[in-house]
Amino acid sequence: MTTETFVKDIKPGLKNLNLIFIVLETGRVTKTKDGHEVRTCKVADKTGSINISVWDDVGNLIQPGDIIRLTKGYASVFKGCLTLYTGRGGDLQKIGEFCMVYSEVPNFSEPNPEYSAQQAPNKTVQNDSGPAAPQPPTGPPATSPASESQNGNGLSAPPGSGGGPHPPHTPSHPPSTRITRSQPNHTAAGPPGPSNNPVSNGKETRRSSKR
């Protein structure tokens, strides 16, 4: 007597599986490089659904609604999805049609997050190593502007020695201009003085000449 396995109990790597299921859907035929025809069918029992890969003529005979007994099958992961296969010496036998209790949910052939989780850390490590490379270039530019600003100040310092006095001269110029403005006022008062002197001198010379 062979023990039957339910769809919910199928795990990757299990062999010598014996199941009874009903065919829900038949997929498109794909041809391999060796010329074999492969068809993926969706089957189910009362515990859930799963995909089974059927080869060559057997796939052409299977129709939706067929109740089939699988003997000596095995389970494997294909493209991240759990899939049933007919092993060596295995067989698919039609034992009825339509009258079977089944459930499409859960679908055990959906992508398993555990496999994607195993691939995710590898990608994240690569991504982490990727941004680490651009970080060093960002460091030097940050230091370069500071150094450039310091160098600019340093370079301005030598002219700044001339430029350093300029800012003090600039405040000195406004007072000097004020002084010049005040000077013309003083000079305005001044010219009558010197003008009187030459006039007095002229008179004295004239008087001296008359004398």
From Swiss-Prot:
GO molecular function: DNA binding; single-stranded DNA binding
Keywords: DNA damage, DNA repair, DNA-binding, Nucleus, Ubl conjugation
Portion annotated as DNA-binding: 22-92
Keyword Ubl conjugation among UniProt keywords: yes
Biased composition (Polar residues): 115-128
Pro residues biased stretches: 133-143, 165-174
Record CDD domains: SoSSB_OBF
GO biological process: DNA damage response; DNA repair; double-strand break repair via homologous recombination; mitotic G2/M transition checkpoint; response to ionizing radiation
The keyword Acyltransferase is annotated on this UniProt entry: no
UniProt subcellular location: Nucleus
InterPro entries found in the cross-reference section: NA-bd_OB-fold, SOSS-B, Ssb-like_OB
Cellular component GO terms held in the UniProt record: nucleus; SOSS complex
Post-translational changes noted in the entry: Phosphorylated by ATM in response to DNA damage. Phosphorylation prevents degradation by the proteasome, hence stabilization of the protein and accumulation within cells.
Sequence segments annotated as region (Disordered): 110-211
Domain of life: Eukaryota
Its job: Component of the SOSS complex, a multiprotein complex that functions downstream of the MRN complex to promote DNA repair and G2/M checkpoint. In the SOSS complex, acts as a sensor of single-stranded DNA that binds to single-stranded DNA, in particular to polypyrimidines. The SOSS complex associates with DNA lesions and influences diverse endpoints in the cellular DNA damage response including cell-cycle checkpoint activation, recombinational repair and maintenance of genomic stability.
Classification via PANTHER family: OB FOLD NUCLEIC ACID BINDING PROTEIN-RELATED, SOSS COMPLEX SUBUNIT B1
Protein family per UniProt: Belongs to the SOSS-B family. SOSS-B1 subfamily.
Quaternary organization: Component of the SOSS complex, composed of SOSS-B (SOSS-B1/NABP2 or SOSS-B2/NABP1), SOSS-A/INTS3 and SOSS-C/INIP. SOSS complexes containing SOSS-B1/NABP2 are more abundant than complexes containing SOSS-B2/NABP1. Directly interacts with ATM, SOSS-A/INTS3 and RAD51. Interacts with INTS7.
Protein name per its UniProtKB record: SOSS complex subunit B1
Lineage of source species: Eukaryota, Metazoa, Chordata, Craniata, Vertebrata
